[in-house]
Amino acid sequence: MQDLRIVLVIVGALAIAALVLHGLWTNQRNKRAQQKNTAPKAVAAKRSSESRDVDGFDADGIGKVRVVPRNGSPVRDNDPVISSVPQFSAGDEDDVLPGQDAISAESQQEPFEEAQQESFRGDWKDVYVINISAREGSYIYGRDLKHALRILGFRFGEMDIYHRHLEMDGQGEVLFSLINMVKPGTFEPSQMDRMMTPGVSLFMQLPGIGRGLAHFDLMLKAADKLASEVDGILLDTSHQPLSEYYLTQCRDELKAYDHQ
């Protein structure tokens, strides 16, 4: 009797193992059949996708964020908070589609002055930035920064950053602002004496038309004075030494903005 039970147990185990093996074999066979059916479709889809990429139909045109303002590497504590703002030209036109050549010649003609204005639109950025970096191996110390900001008329305010208003007493519109290069970019006035940072960034959002260039020149003067007070170095948005080429480019863009 005992021997029979042992035999039944062995047979049962073998039966279960056979069922499991059969199920696995069936499953693998179905997967291979499915892969054979879907492989041609996948290849065709891939070729179609590659064709679209070559023709440019899938391009979304979105560039890097620059604050807005041109800066995908891993986030570090000293990564700049302000990046770059992509430039978009309102004069850009979509590709001509079939059938659009039927538009009348009259509707395609524009006065020369209007076309000339169109060429200037969108050639400026939404935000202009001047970085002030500590010298290599050093930091900008909060106590020096606080002293310089007081001299230059900056006031701590919205978004927990410093702002330079039209009036030295903090009245009027904001001309430009200052943030910490260390994320999240804010300051704590009560901790300024113990703070140190690799750098700060001055940024100016576009003001009303006609005031862009004037505000930028004021920001440049403030940046130069601030760098002198904290023994810093002026850098552009690419974190290269501030050059006449960069300043000329900014001024030309703002002139176009002011005269649109």
From Swiss-Prot:
Keyword vocabulary terms for this entry: Cell cycle, Cell division, Cell inner membrane, Cell membrane, Membrane, Transmembrane, Transmembrane helix
Major place of residence: membrane
Subcellular location, record wording: Cell inner membrane
Spans annotated as Disordered: 31-98
Record GO biological process: division septum assembly; FtsZ-dependent cytokinesis
Function description: Essential cell division protein that stabilizes the FtsZ protofilaments by cross-linking them and that serves as a cytoplasmic membrane anchor for the Z ring. Also required for the recruitment to the septal ring of downstream cell division proteins.
Name assigned to this protein: Cell division protein ZipA
Protein source organism: Tolumonas auensis (strain DSM 9187 / NBRC 110442 / TA 4)
